[in-house]
Amino acid sequence: MSRGSIEIPLRDTDEVIELDFDQLPEGDEVISILKQEHTQLHIWIALALEYFKQGKTEDFVKLLEAARIDGNLDYRDHEKDQMTCLDTLAAYYVQQARKEKNKDNKKELITQATLLYTMADKIIMYDQNHLLGRACFCLLEGDKMDQADAQFHFVLNQSPNNIPALLGKACISFNKKDYRGALAYYKKALRTNPGCPAGVRLGMGHCFVKLNKLDKARLAFGRALDLNPTCVGALVGLAVLELNNKEADSIKNGVQLLSKAYTIDPSNPMVLNHLANHFFFKKDYSKVQHLALHAFHNTEVEAMQAESCYQLARSFHVQEDYDQAFQYYYQATQFAAASFVLPFFGLGQMYIYRGDKENASQCFEKVLKAYPNNYETMKILGSLYAASDDQEKRDIAKSHLKKVTEQYPDDVEAWIELAQILEQTDIQNALSAYGTATRILQEKVQADVPPEILNNVGALHFRLGNLGEAKKYFLASLDRAKAEAEHDEHYYNSISVTTSYNLARLYEGLCEFHESEKLYKNILREHPNYVDCYLRLGAMARDKGNFYEASDWFKEALQINQDHPDAWSLIGNLHLAKQEWGPGQKKFERILKQPSTQNDTYSMLALGNVWLQTLHQPTRDREKEKRHQDRALAIYKQVLRNDSKNLFAANGIGAVLAHKGYVREARDVFAQVREATADISDVWLNLAHIYVEQKQYISAVQMYENCLRKFYKHQNTEVLLYLARALFKCGKLQECKQILLKARHVAPNDTVLMFNVALVLQRLATLVLKDEKSNLKAVLNAVKELELAHRYFNYLSKVGDKMRFDLALATSEARQCSDLLSQAQYHVARARKQDEEEKEMRTKQEQEKEVLRQKLLKEQEEKHLREIEEQKKLLEQRAQYLEKTRNLLSFTGEMETPKEKKQRGGGGRRSKKNGEFEEFVNDDSDEELAPRKKKRKKGGSSSGEQGEGGDEGEGGEKKKKKRRKRPQKAAGSDDDEEQTPQSKKRQPKKKEKPAKLERTPPSMKGKIKSKAIISSSEDDSDEDKLKIADEGHARDSDSDDGPRKSQKRVISDSDSDNGNKSGSDAGSPQKSQRSDEDSDNAFARKRRRQISGSDNDSAQSRRSSGGSDNESRAASNSAESERGSDRGSDNEGSERASGNQSEQEVEKSERGSDESD
């Protein structure tokens, strides 16, 4: 079937030349015809495209190149054909550049395409086809994706359904990781043209994979294969999906798909790389290398090349060809994108193999940046940084390993690595990490704990001071090492040696020096080159004070290693300890001359200390002193430059500043060092020295004392001397003396201490002797101490150490002591005389005190006798008054008896509530009263005497009432439930003597206001004084109380308000005695009625009872007691009667008696 033809018009004629597409002539022939006939440009382009379709690309290029020059442009719209010609040729060059593997040729083709597109821009810039071609060219260049996006966008704005523009936008979105956007563009293109090629389905499948929609991706790849069975991309996509299922059948299907793709396109780099990966896991490394190399050479895409190099590198890695592996890993990292970090992981391993930890760390850091929580990477980085000297990196390692142990708590290696990092900074957590590793080994792995871990745990306990635990672990490590020696004798014997050395150090800490010495020597017998054993033996000898033996051991170490810095340092320290500054200085300078130890910090500090020490020696050469200061300062600065955190160098700088006189600056330096660490004793001492210089003696003393407590288990004579100096300066000589004596007990032969003790004794003695108030004992003690100081100074002036103090000063002080001793007799005599005077004065004072004491005793005795006499007189007066009162009561009772019998009514009595009558209750006759009172007198003071003794005076009565206040019941209480047991016991006796009631005559009704009852009480608290019993406080408002009580009382319905003021008599001790007092009260009532009957009788009664002032007052109080009885109280011992009320009631009673007459 003919594919068609094209007609070429002949010039200046109407004839044409027809060229059949199936029989196209050579390109050059066609070009000559077209040139000869001056053919229009669009015919050139059509012929060129036909040549391209037939695969004749050379003729296609020749035609288009010739058309650019010779094409006829004399027709309408020739600009569009001219642009099409340029764009078509440029698109061909772009396609060729995409396929070209040679970089130079590719660059040349891209340059030609760029030139052609630029020329086309000048003709028609915004043509859609032109813009599409140029956008595709930008995509090929890779770094012009934004320009391509803008051009595709411009086309879509003009033609929203333009399929090339949609596919271009989809490609750009996919590369920008906007997979949803890319999928949307692919879908729109597919809807616009459902007959799109398989590549559109392939792009959709890749989008579905990125969106994790694997089922849809599988369908898309399958549909692409349906449309194009030879679509390699779809086959590879399906193969990868199958391989990722990680099942045997799926893997088999995936490999078959890859094989099919390889059959279709054996040079496809993607297929080759996937097959290489498959054969790597099949351990067919030769095929891996063949396929990966083939893939590498068949692609110019760097991502593909990186994959190929990685496959090659790991195949060589697993075959332990580390040089080839390193080469390909490195090449892969050059091609790889930022997200492809597997080559960096392998390259890091190669660097570790080569010992280049720095580059290895950089590689793994790149991996960790892409995958922040990758377990293997964090573990490797932690291990690398753990061995670093940089503390920051060690902190990073600690952080990584902590994350590893959190993600995988059973990783023993990670726990051990973490413990090793923590050993230097956090011993407790290091022990915890080792404990976790040990537990995992024993419980999870079911394995024995390695001797290395046991040794490390023991060393940590040793550092913490847990010597018992450390010993246990060291012994366990030795046992494990012996057991494991069967498998690797050489290795585990070396472990045993290290553990034995540690055990010997432990015995040193336990002060078992014999055991440690034995272990060190055993190690040296087996390993004579173990230098540390020589050094420890020398250190033990040095601590015992055997400097020569120590020096021999250190020299033995130098026989093994002539340049061993520790041995030279220890020898230098021996010289410094003996104050041999020159030889010591040479030893440290020798260390610094060695290339390997030219910056040795310890040696530089020791040299600085030597120069600093020379400043303490007395010298008059100021220039020399300044040179020494500058040298020391320069050395300390050099140490700080090498190690900015060296606190000892900073402390040295502070000391030099203090020597130069910059005391404030020195104190600031020392304070900063002390803030950084409180574990350096020198800093504390230097601060205390500064305080002394600033005359802050109290602060200095506190600092010295704190330093002694914190750093020195035993008394340190040097620090004690500093403390004594501070106390001496602040004038505390006694405390200074005690401190110096402590130091003397430690170092009795120290001449400096002896000099200072003598000086303090001399000053103390001088103060005591000059003080005129000093007693004889103090003066004698001062003379004794002065003599001791004199002997000390004399001794020191002859045999003292010239290097430590001036002997002439001791001679001068001895002479001063001698002068003071020559004056001592005067001070002793003065003190003795003063002491004798004081003794005489004390004797005289004692005698005066004794006389005064005897006088006071005599006065007290006389006063006591007078009180006894007065008491006897009072008792006699009381007895007389009681007797008179009884006689009076008996007489008046006999006089009143006939009249009462006439007035007495019936046996019944009217209720108090009616308020019509008051009842008078009579008790026994006079004959029955006397025996009852006699019985009471036998038991003590009679109740009658107590009751009537209260009549001595109204003032006395009130005092007694205030002192004997009782808890009160509410006014108007109806019950007497709180009667004491005594009153209940006496009630039957009262019933045997029936009360004789007597009605008040009607003419007396409402006129008799109150009656008093004179009672006697057995209360001993009134000291046998007489008292008026006021019944106003014990009144009950209800007449029903009468039957329950055998007491005789006057019941009145008047003055109820006053009665309400009285309280309850419950619990009163007098209540139990009222039955005995009723007979006296009866006589008193009879007498009062008779007195109220006539004024003459009343006057006669008053005269008979008024034999004395006291008796007159008693009678008056008795009348007042009668008025108190009107309140209805049945407690005759109550003490609440008021004087004013009593006077008013007396007047009322008298008026009532007048009316009754």
Curated annotation (Swiss-Prot):
Compositional bias of kind Acidic residues: 917-928
Repeat (TPR) positions are 41-75, 129-162, 163-196, 198-231, 235-268, 306-339, 341-374, 412-444, 451-484, 497-530, 531-564, 566-598, 613-646, 648-680, 681-714, 717-750
Q: Name one GO cellular component term.
A: euchromatin
Compositional bias (Low complexity) spans?
1057-1068
Assembly information from the UniProt record: Component of the PAF1 complex, which at least consists of cdc73, paf1, leo1, ctr9 and rtf1. The PAF1 complex interacts with PHF5A.
**Identification of the protein by name:** RNA polymerase-associated protein CTR9 homolog
Query: Quick one: where's region Disordered?
Result: 889-1157
Q: What is this protein's function per UniProt? A: Component of the PAF1 complex (PAF1C) which has multiple functions during transcription by RNA polymerase II. PAF1C associates with RNA polymerase II, is involved in transcriptional elongation and in histone modifications including methylation on histone H3 'Lys-4' (H3K4me3).
Name a single GO biological process.
Answer: negative regulation of transcription by RNA polymerase II
As recorded in Swiss-Prot or TrEMBL, the protein's gene is named ctr9
Q: Which UniProt keywords apply?
A: Nucleus, Repeat, TPR repeat, Transcription, Transcription regulation
Which InterPro entries does the protein's record reference?
Ctr9 (IPR031101), TPR-like_helical_dom_sf (IPR011990), TPR_rpt (IPR019734)
Q: Which superkingdom heads the taxonomic lineage of this protein's source?
A: Eukaryota
PROSITE patterns (alphabetical): TPR, TPR_REGION
Taking the first listed entry, what is the main subcellular location of this protein, grouped into a coarse class? nucleus
**Polar residues composition bias: residue spans:** 1091-1109
Q: Which Gene3D superfamilies match?
A: Tetratricopeptide repeat domain
Show the ranges annotated as biased composition (Basic residues): 901-912, 958-968, 983-993
Q: Which Pfam families match?
A: TPR_10, TPR_16, TPR_19, TPR_8
- Compartment(s): Nucleus speckle
Molecular function GO labels: RNA polymerase II complex binding
- Biased composition of type Basic and acidic residues is found at 1024-1044, 1120-1135, 1145-1157
